Design a protein with these regions (language model features):
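Active-site core of glycosidic bond-cleaving carbohydrate-active enzymes
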Residues: 11-96, 100-172
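Buried, small/hydrophobic-residue-enriched core segments of structured protein domains
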Residues: 4-6, 13
Length: 172
């Protein structure tokens, strides 16, 4: 979604944007079994606002953060295409789903089960399980579409900067 939105917004043309638009919307609400297409865990994501960590789907926090970013991209593209708010508002709402895996005491992204309970065995430097190619310290800053929202969530600029500085000294 982000590649298509970025290309269109930058003025790159030569493709059927309406077909791509429909494909982006479909991909945000489907997972073709046995393929890498669509969103694994989309049912949980759409219902709960995050991919739950107890439904047999790994990398659930990473998926939640990536899906939120892609929803922002879909929303942004929809606005550029002049799509009605009734069609794109759900993507604007889902773009904020990153907040649903934010643990306010830890100031990090942490997995939750389908009852809304944060992972009691959370390990901030674990590269497996709830994350992919990184750990909670890395992924907690993957809110590229709403940096001010993340800064506010972490308690303001001072707290955000302290957390960001910690990424460079935490082992793992």
């Amino acid at each position: 979604a982000s590649v298509v939105a970025d290309a269109y917004i930058k003025g790159l043309r030569g493709y059927d944007i309406e077909t791509l638009w429909e494909a982006l919307k479909h991909g945000a609400n489907a997972h073709l079994r046995g393929t890498a297409s669509g969103r694994l865990g989309y049912e949980s994501y759409n219902q709960l606002g995050y991919v739950a960590n107890n439904i047999g789907i790994g990398q659930n926090v990473a998926r939640t953060l990536e899906y939120a970013y892609n929803d922002w991209a879909i929303y942004t593209l929809g606005k550029k295409l002049g799509k009605p708010e009734s069609e794109i508002d759900i993507y604007k709402k889902h773009a904020l789903n990153y907040k649903n895996v934010y643990h306010p005491e830890r100031k990090l992204m942490v997995g939750k089960d389908n009852k809304g309970v944060f992972n009691p065995n959370f390990d901030a430097v674990d590269w497996s399980g709830e994350f992919c190619e990184g750990n909670s310290w890395h992924w907690s800053f993957c809110v590229f579409h709403d940096p001010q929202g993340l800064i506010n969530l972490m308690g303001g600029k001072k707290e955000f900067n302290a957390m960001m500085d910690s990424v460079f000294v935490i082992p793992g």
